[in-house]
Amino acid sequence: EKTNFEQMGLAPPITQTMTTYVLGDDLYDESFSIDTQAGEFMGEYGVGVSEAIGVGEPKKVTALEIWLFDKNDIKTATKVLMSQHAFNDPGIRARLEPKGELVLVEPQSQVLLETATLQLLATVVDLEYGRGPLPSDSYFERITLELAIWPRQG
């Protein structure tokens, strides 16, 4: 169920979507357009697989990347959502740091991305770790994110 931001005293977002990664969706890569009510293109946002661990099928995804592209900003904002294991692993951290700010994923946690004229609030709605021979809390069985976009105030 989508968050009613107006009940929280916030302006309604320009766009709001839910997306779920499930173990086995090796090609998970979602992107969405941001348009004004008049249909003017403002940018895009999305989420996709950033890093997997272990070997074999399906991929054991240990980190996802959330990004926000603003047509008025030369730089795309990116944050990397990491499993507990990945967040505490110096080798994985070193590989992923060039992609963007590293964030530990926790249920109900929120991550804010900002560009010149847009902001994206990502909320971890649901998080379930895979169980298996790999370290505990190392890869996602499923993760549901709510992504909401507003004009940036300022």
For the regions a language model picked out, list residue spans one by one:
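Surface-exposed, beta-sheet-biased, low-hydrophobicity segments with strongly acidic/polar composition
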Residues: 1-154
